[in-house]
Amino acid sequence: MADRDRPLLAVLFDADNVPAKYADAILREVTSIGEPALRRVYGDWTSGRLKAWSERILELGLVAHQDTSNTTGKNASDIGLVIDAMDILHGGRFDGFVIVSSDSDFTALANRLREDGLTVIGIGEAKAPEALRNVCNRFILIENLIGEPQPAKGRAKADDALSLIEGAMDKIDQDDDWYALGQIGQAIQNAHPDFDTRTYGHRKLSALVDALKGVETRKQGNQLMMRLKRAG
């Protein structure tokens, strides 16, 4: 990785799969993670289906790549994005990729990029398949970026995160029953790339933990420590 304060990211949008109305929120999120130095959006701009994207490209500082589909089956924009990603990878300039899509076709690409040691962040909708979510270092749900309410059936409550915390503690496997909050968060993220405290209604892990009935916390120096509440 290059010696810089913020990771240099290549951001690749699948315009056929992600609505343009989400672009602002996505770019804000990416900017909070690193420097989105390369921003490309892929689609068939002759089809008329991407009018909303066409109207935002210059405003958002995106570079549009034309991929005209002349065959049935595999989406031409998917192929174009994959080819570009490999060219960018071999250029050796970037620390990581952000793939903006909910399409499982990019699972193999994400895996290939990670094999070369690059960080891969996926951003997509809740419909994104588990295979794509799990192959990324981190997967961010668009619904969490725009504050779109989840259907009651799929809405997660704070206490639903307790099993993830217990699993993280098992992974860490230490003798002391007090765990550093940052250590817990990293263990959860490693096991569940799509973990996001916003899914449970809280912006930070500390706020989520405070809302849990089954844990207790204490300060130790500058660290917040936590453990499972003991029975009785």
Model-assigned labels for residue ranges:
Residues 1-84, 89-90, 119:
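Domain-level signal for Mg2+-assisted phosphodiester chemistry and nucleotide/NA-binding surfaces
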Residues 12, 42, 95-102, 109, ...:
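Acidic beta-strand-to-loop metal/phosphate-binding motif
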Residues 39, 107-111, 116-119, 129:
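P-loop/Walker A NTP-binding module and the surrounding RecA-like catalytic core of P-loop NTPases
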Residues 49-54, 124-134:
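Short, glycine/polar-rich helix-capping loops at beta-to-alpha or helix-loop-helix junctions
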Residues 60, 116, 135-136:
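Short, structured coil segments at secondary-structure junctions
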Residues 64, 97, 139-140:
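Short, well-ordered beta-strand core segments
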Residues 130-143, 147:
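Contiguous mid-protein beta-loop-alpha structural module that forms a pocket-lining wall or clamp
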Residues 148-232:
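N-terminal regulatory modules in eukaryotic regulatory proteins
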